[in-house]
Structure formats: structure tokens, C-alpha cells
């Protein structure tokens, strides 16, 4: 391959096309209708490697350039390219998959240094909480911001606690007769008094050891208190509480409209649209009057998801009045996965997903109707059937497929989802790492990308592998800000033509190895052994990462 490319000075997109077609040629099915595939009676599409060797040995540049043109022409049908790649890479290989993975990892480490990603990692603040939690907008703790009142007074507390700067005010929801906006003038004094009292009585956060001021209050049902003593439950619930406070602090600012659009899919007219959506009277099949009341009056269980607001189910109720019953039923039965509920309990194969940021970056609609796939489990991503311009997405612990009509849309959509996963338990190791590489490989092979977009894709590959590598001082870069992350990925330096060609080869090889690793080792054909891979050996790039910052 390399001899052919260098001998005939093939570079750029033509080299990338040649490299890709060589990998899929053995499984290519050609009809020979155009007859332009036949050289001396042999179909070069099905025997591409033999034709390359023959053209190189015979020093026939005309035939060599014809081969390259055929490869480039084949790349125009990206759907066929993806299917052929998938078919080819899923076959057992007699090769050193482990060694190739390690070489790709070493090359990506070098690219991590040169692409500017490492410089950006140095600039990031240290991640304060190493207990990474995956957050998305499908769940919300927003109802607990609203103040429970009885006869114009805040209901009495039964217990108090705190999480960092947030006071936790536990109460009996049955004692309240309404819930109101915490900014209303009449209760502002009581609200501030609660903050001061919690700060006085509990000067240290029991979860983090934080000793600063208390600035906000969340009003939690007393039934929640025992579950918050469970470490995993508290870790997730506290992060959603923190996210709800951040959204609440945007009330009255321009960002409020974006948050409301992202959460509910619609923005009511008038002031304070967030409070309107949360406190507006609804026609529930029960006596509950608002979304806040319906949520707070219903207890969850030991699953933290069962205590949060299910935003996808709420959007179903907003779009279809008769589906408010689903919202009540979902909480009463303490379901934890909204997509499982829609797919299995309600036999709904699709749902609406909103992504305001992707819309702003690509110009596409923020509203997408997506197909609900399988719940997260072994090989869920790899078992998902992708056709035409579909890409995989994820809400909570459930996969879906969505249509991406351009390479830019596919790139941004994938980057946002990877950022959400990275913010969680880390995507560069175990199955999550494989899923991340698979998603990026889908973008690389299914859509026609420009050099600028491939440069961004390389930075995503580097991030998937090394973004959360501990720095020299042991701290982990904090990538939590999605806006900054996308700026770094999408607005970084463009690769030169030589760098682009080498980067494509590395990304292509890593994708091929991942698909082979996840499929071929599970498929055995007579007379052909699948590669034997120790997952720890293949995926363990940590040894190189541990030295990375010392070498930096």
C-alpha cells in the first residue's frame, strides 16, 4: 500500500479513498455492469490489492491512476462504503489485533500532543469531583427548587442538611397546599433565613467536606432522606440538584429561554417562562395541579432516577393532552428509564429529542424524532442496525438512532454525546471506550468530511482515548463546560495534507480493529480462527498515559 501511494505520489483524499477501498475490496460485490472495473479480464474492485501490486511492479502509472479513480468513485456512495466496511471488518482476521491497537494508541498519543488537545488539557481547571456522573437533560431536579407553603407560610422542616452551597430542607409534602416561586418577595426573608440557619448548624458539607457559604435552598420530601445515605444514590442526585440550581440561576437572563426550549420543547410568552412551565395548572387525571406538585407528592425508591422529573414523558404530555396520564403512571410505578417505558409499556417506537446547541452550530432543527433502540447492555451499540444517514445517540442508559443529513451535523451530534459520556465514568476504557470509537468510526466512514472536519474528528479520537488522563500533579482536567469543549474540538488547528493523511490512516485502523475485536472474536468460521484478545491488553493504554505528562 505505502509503496503504491509513494511511487505514484497519491495523497490527500485520493490516498484516503485508496486506503479505505483496499480494506473492503475482498468482500466487495461488483456487478461489472459498467465494465470499467475490468483490467485484463479481472475485476479490480474485487481484487484491488492484486491490481495495485501488478501496477506497481509493472510500473504502469496509467493503470495506477485508474485504480485510484475507481476507489475515489466508490467513496461517493457512503452508505455502501459503510456497509462494506462493516461486512469486511466483522470477518475473522489472522493478525495481531492487540499489537495494532497499541500502535494506534501510541500514534494517537503523539497526535494528542501535536493537535493542541494536550495544551488545552493543561489550561483546564482541575476536576473538583472525581466521582464522574453522566448528566443529560432527560431528567431534572427542578421541582425541588419551588417552595412548599401552607396558608402563606413555608411548611415546617423535619430535617436539614446541605450539599456544597445548597441547603437541603426536608419536609412532609402532604403538609403543603401549594408550591410557589422562591423569588417571590413575600417569602424572600424566610428563604434567606433558612440559608443562614443551615449554614450555622451545618458548616461542613457531609458529602464533599465543603465549608463555604450556603446560597440556595432545595425543598426535599422527607421520604428521600434515607436514600441520600446511599453513596451511589447521593452522588447522582446531588449532581442533578446542582444542575437544577445552575438552570434556576439563569431565570431572568437570555439563557433562560434556551434552557426552557431544551427542557420542554416550547417557550411560553411572558415573563419567567421556566416558572410558568413548572407551576402552570395542568389537566392531570389526578388532583395534582402542576408538574411540581405531581412530582413532589410522589415518592421514588432506591433508584435515584425515580425521584427526578422525566422530561421526555412530560414533553409527550405537552404534545398530547391524553398522555398526561403516562406522566402520573410513570412516577407512580417508579420507572427509571423513559425510553423503555415508551417502547415496552406504551408500544411507542419513537420519541422527540431536543438539542438546541446542535441546532445553533449546524443550522438544523432543534427537534428530532428519533427511533428508540435497546437499553444499554453488552454490545448494544454494535447490535444496533444503522441504515442510511442514521447515527447512534443516547438518553440516560438507553440508545436511540437519529438522522444526520450532513457530515457537520453528524460530527457535532457525536461530539455532544461523547462529551456527555466522558463527563460520566470515562469513555477511554472498557466497553464505553469501544462504543466511542465505534461512533466516531461511523462518522469517519459514513459521511463525506472536509479536512477541517477530519481535523476535529481526530481531536475527538484523542479525547476519547486520553482526555481524562491524570496530569503530572495527579489532577484530572475538568471538561464539564460543553461550550468550551466544542470550541476546542471544532475550532482547533486544521491538519496539513500530510498530517490529514496520516491521521486518517490511524483513525481508520483503530476503527477496523475495534469492529474486528467486537465482532470477529465472537464469530467462528470453519478453518479460520478469530483473534484471541485479552481486553486488558488491548484497551490498557493507561501505562502510556501515566508517562504522558512527565514527557510533556
Curated annotation (Swiss-Prot):
InterPro entries in the cross-refs: Orbi_NS1
Annotated family: Belongs to the orbivirus non-structural protein NS1 family.
Identification of the protein by name: Non-structural protein NS1
Taxonomy of the source species: Viruses, Riboviria, Orthornavirae, Duplornaviricota, Resentoviricetes
Amino acid at each position: 500500500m505505502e509503496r503504491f501511494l509513494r511511487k505514484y505520489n497519491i495523497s490527500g483524499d485520493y490516498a484516503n479513498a485508496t486506503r479505505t477501498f483496499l480494506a473492503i475490496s475482498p468482500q466487495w460485490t461488483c456487478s461489472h455492469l459498467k465494465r470499467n472495473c475490468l483490467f485484463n479480464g479481472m475485476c479490480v474492485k474485487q481484487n484491488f490489492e492484486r491490481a495495485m501490486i501488478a501496477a506497481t511492479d509493472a510500473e504502469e502509472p496509467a493503470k495506477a491512476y485508474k485504480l485510484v479513480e475507481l476507489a475515489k468513485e466508490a467513496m461517493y456512495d457512503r452508505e455502501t462504503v459503510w456497509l462494506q466496511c462493516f461486512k469486511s471488518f466483522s470477518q475473522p482476521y489472522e493478525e495481531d489485533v492487540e499489537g495494532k491497537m497499541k500502535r494506534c494508541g501510541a500514534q494517537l498519543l503523539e497526535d494528542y500532543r501535536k493537535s493542541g488537545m494536550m495544551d488545552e488539557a493543561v489550561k483546564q481547571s482541575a476536576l473538583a469531583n472525581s466521582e464522574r456522573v453522566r448528566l443529560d437533560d432527560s431528567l431534572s431536579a427542578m421541582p425541588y427548587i419551588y417552595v412548599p407553603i401552607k396558608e402563606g407560610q413555608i411548611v415546617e422542616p423535619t430535617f436539614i442538611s446541605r450539599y456544597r452551597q445548597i441547603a437541603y430542607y426536608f419536609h412532609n409534602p402532604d403538609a403543603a397546599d401549594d408550591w410557589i416561586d422562591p423569588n417571590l418577595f413575600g417569602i424572600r426573608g424566610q428563604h434567606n433565613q433558612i440559608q443562614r440557619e443551615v449554614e450555622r448548624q451545618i458548616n461542613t458539607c457531609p458529602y464533599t467536606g465543603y465549608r463555604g457559604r450556603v446560597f440556595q435552598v432545595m425543598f426535599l420530601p422527607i421520604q428521600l432522606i434515607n436514600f441520600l445515605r446511599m453513596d451511589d444514590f447521593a452522588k447522582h442526585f446531588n449532581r442533578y440538584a446542582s444542575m437544577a440550581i445552575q438552570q434556576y440561576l439563569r431565570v431572568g437572563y437570555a439563557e433562560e429561554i434556551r434552557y426552557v426550549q431544551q427542557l420542554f420543547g416550547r417557550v411560553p410568552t411572558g415573563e419567567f417562562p421556566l416558572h410558568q412551565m413548572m407551576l402552570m395548572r395542568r389537566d392531570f387525571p389526578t388532583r395534582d395541579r402542576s408538574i411540581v406538585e405531581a412530582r413532589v407528592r410522589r415518592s421514588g425508591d432506591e433508584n435515584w432516577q425515580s425521584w427526578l422529573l422525566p422530561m421526555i414523558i412530560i414533553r409527550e404530555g405537552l404534545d398530547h393532552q391524553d398522555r398526561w396520564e403516562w406522566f402520573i403512571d410513570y412516577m407512580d410505578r417508579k420507572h427509571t428509564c423513559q425510553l423503555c417505558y415508551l417502547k415496552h409499556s406504551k408500544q411507542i417506537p419513537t420519541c422527540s429529542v431536543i438539542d438546541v446547541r446542535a441546532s445553533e452550530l449546524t443550522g438544523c432543527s432543534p427537534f428530532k424524532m428519533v427511533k428508540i433502540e435497546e437499553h444499554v447492555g453488552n454490545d448494544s451499540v454494535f447490535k444496533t442496525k444503522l441504515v442510511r444517514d442514521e447515527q447512534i445517540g443516547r438518553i440516560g442508559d438507553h440508545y436511540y438512532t437519529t438522522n444526520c443529513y450532513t457530515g457537520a451535523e453528524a460530527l457535532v451530534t457525536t461530539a455532544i454525546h461523547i462529551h456527555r459520556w466522558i463527563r460520566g465514568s470515562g469513555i477511554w476504557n472498557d466497553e464505553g471506550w469501544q462504543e466511542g470509537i465505534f461512533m466516531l468510526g461511523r462518522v469517519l466512514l459514513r459521511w463525506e468530511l472536509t479536512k477541517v472536519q477530519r481535523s476535529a474528528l481526530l481531536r475527538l479520537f484523542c479525547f476519547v482515548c486520553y482526555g481524562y488522563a491524570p496530569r503530572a500533579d495527579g489532577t484530572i482536567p475538568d471538561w464539564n463546560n460543553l461550550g468550551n469543549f466544542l470550541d476546542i474540538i471544532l475550532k482547533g488547528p486544521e491538519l496539513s495534507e500530510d498530517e490529514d493523511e496520516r491521521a486518517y490512516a490511524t483513525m481508520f485502523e483503530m476503527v477496523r480493529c475495534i469492529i474486528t475485536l467486537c465482532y470477529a472474536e465472537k464469530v467462528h468460521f470453519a478453518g479460520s480462527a478469530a483473534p484471541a484478545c485479552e481486553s486488558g491488553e488491548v484497551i490498557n493504554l493507561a501505562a502510556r498515559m501515566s508517562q504522558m505528562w512527565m514527557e510533556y
